Design a protein with these regions (language model features):
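Mg2+/Mn2+-dependent nuclease catalytic core
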Residues: 111-133
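Acidic-basic catalytic patches of nuclease active cores, encompassing PD-(D/E)XK
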Residues: 15-78
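Conserved catalytic cores of phosphodiester-cleaving nucleases, focusing on short active-site segments
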Residues: 91-93, 104-112, 130
Length: 171
């Protein structure tokens, strides 16, 4: 079967729409606690729990989760097993209603107009994890979402320039 069947694409599109709608609702209705000065994990926790509870009746049959822990198990030199390469997903949607199963991982990063903040998300510990599939092994897509700390005109053009540059392509 086609990895990106039309049903899978339709479900993925709906998942993204639900997440974006939840974001807009929180930004509008909970500006006191859902804003750029909060820690990233606080924002994704609130968003994840809000989606899981408030968006239960939107017609998606899968499960939302946030801050899922992932790791790799390897054999140590002494012969025992050990956990290595620990990581955490910000928000994840999973459904096995159809095959292949749909697992969408959303990673959120705070972005402003500065080079320093963009550079913090480049390389092996940044966007490369989505290119190499470290967070969404076997999935056709993973989603990195920028949380803009400044107005869109201040952040987005510089980010687009960076992503289209040689340095951005290497990241």
């Amino acid at each position: 079967s086609d990895v990106c069947s039309s049903d899978l694409k339709s479900d993925a599109k709906k998942v993204v729409q639900v997440l974006c709608e939840a974001w807009r609702e929180l930004a509008r209705d909970s500006a006191q606690t859902f804003h750029g000065k909060e820690k990233e994990h606080t924002l994704t926790e609130l968003l994840g729990e809000y989606i899981r509870t408030a968006k239960a009746g939107v017609g998606l049959t899968g499960n939302w989760s946030y801050e899922d822990r992932l790791a790799t198990i390897e054999r140590s030199p002494t012969g025992g097993l050990k956990v290595v390469k620990r990581r955490r997903t910000d928000i994840q949607y999973f459904s096995d209603r159809q095959q292949p199963a749909l697992r969408l991982v959303f990673e959120f990063k705070k972005i402003d107009h500065t080079k320093a903040r963009r550079d913090a998300y480049a390389g092996a510990e940044g966007m490369e994890r989505f290119v190499t599939g470290d967070y969404s092994v076997g999935q056709p897509v993973a989603l990195m979402a920028g949380m803009l700390l400044k107005p869109t005109p201040d952040c987005v053009p510089a980010l687009r320039t960076y992503l289209s540059s040689a340095a951005g392509q290497a990241a």
